[in-house]
């Protein structure tokens, strides 16, 4: 397939951009938070990203800040989102406002600045200006063969220093994710979320990769997707280099995620494996997300700070740049 960029319409009636090379096909939805809705590996025909069970919501505008996880879920399509200026529960923000669940960037419409082809490279550039925070986020996506590079430039437009949570939320689904799928990473430390009340992991416990303490006191091996229903939230840290890989030997396919650990020193490992019986998953979600970011735990900025998390501090006018890569390859 020749390299190109084209305009398409995806589920829900949303206009989308499709970047195509000989190695992959990537779709993004500018009006829905610049969500990267699919990444199809050309060799196997597998879409490595996950979509929510209810599908992409109908095309609409707003709300752009979710007071609760339920409101967020009504406009959450799955795929790969960017979370800014908050991650997790809604949190008090400067000026007496609130930053909603997972922030604004994944809900606001983004402006397409340009797209095109440069040799074997398909590219697109987009940006968004947040409403409840004086921030602009610019995103350049470049697809070469089966490797997507997403470079984000975050700018504090004000003269006032501001603390934020900034993270990527790529979520992976079946058939890449299956019982026995292997998880490899450069992390050396694991810490389970301290609000876990069920599932198979003990809450608020540290260990060394690939282990995490189980509720019964034994050790769980996080490097293999289990063959039973459960849900997990674990924070990975102390990266030698910022990378993780999901490997399905039966498919002969791996997805590799890479990032700059000096900007994103931690990553959230979230799994919902047909477990939660009520809203929002109803035992219908089978997903594994590896989410590099600035800060944990994923409980909102104020709570994260109370629990020792380190937000990203942007001075007035400061810019920060990070590149996150997603590629597919043979194991």
Q: Which positions does each model-derived feature cover?
A:
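Surface-exposed acidic/polar loop and edge beta-strand patches at domain peripheries
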Residues: 1-149, 160-163, 170-331
């Amino acid at each position: 397939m020749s390299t190109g960029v084209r305009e398409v319409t995806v589920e829900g009636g949303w206009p989308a951009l499709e970047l195509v090379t000989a190695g992959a096909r990537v779709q993004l939805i500018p009006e829905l938070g610049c969500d990267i809705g699919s990444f199809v590996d050309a060799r196997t025909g597998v879409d490595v990203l996950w979509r929510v069970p209810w599908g992409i919501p109908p095309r609409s505008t707003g709300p752009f800040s979710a007071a609760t996880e339920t409101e967020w879920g009504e406009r959450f399509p799955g795929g790969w989102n960017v979370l800014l200026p908050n991650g997790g529960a809604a949190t008090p923000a400067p000026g007496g406002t609130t930053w909603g669940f997972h922030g604004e960037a994944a809900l606001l419409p983004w402006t397409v600045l340009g797209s095109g082809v440069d040799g074997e490279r398909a590219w697109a550039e987009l940006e968004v200006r947040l409403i409840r925070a004086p921030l602009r986020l610019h995103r350049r996506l470049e697809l070469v063969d089966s490797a997507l590079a997403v470079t984000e430039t975050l700018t504090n437009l004000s003269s006032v220093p501001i603390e934020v949570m900034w993270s990527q939320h790529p979520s992976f689904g079946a058939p890449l994710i299956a019982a026995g799928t292997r998880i490899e990473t450069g992390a050396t430390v694991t810490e389970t979320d301290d609000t876990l009340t069920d599932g198979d992991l003990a809450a608020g416990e540290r260990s060394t990769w690939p282990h995490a303490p189980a509720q019964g006191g034994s050790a769980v091996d996080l490097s293999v997707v289990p063959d039973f229903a459960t849900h997990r939230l674990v924070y990975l840290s102390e990266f030698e280099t910022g990378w993780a890989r999901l490997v399905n030997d039966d498919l002969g396919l791996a997805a590799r995620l890479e990032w700059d650990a000096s900007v994103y020193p931690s990553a959230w490992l979230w799994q919902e494996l047909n477990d939660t019986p009520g809203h929002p998953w109803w035992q219908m979600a089978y997903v594994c997300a590896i989410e590099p970011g600035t800060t944990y735990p994923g409980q909102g900025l104020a709570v994260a700070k109370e629990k020792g998390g380190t937000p990203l501090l942007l001075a007035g006018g400061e810019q920060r740049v990070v590149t996150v890569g997603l590629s597919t390859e043979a194991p």
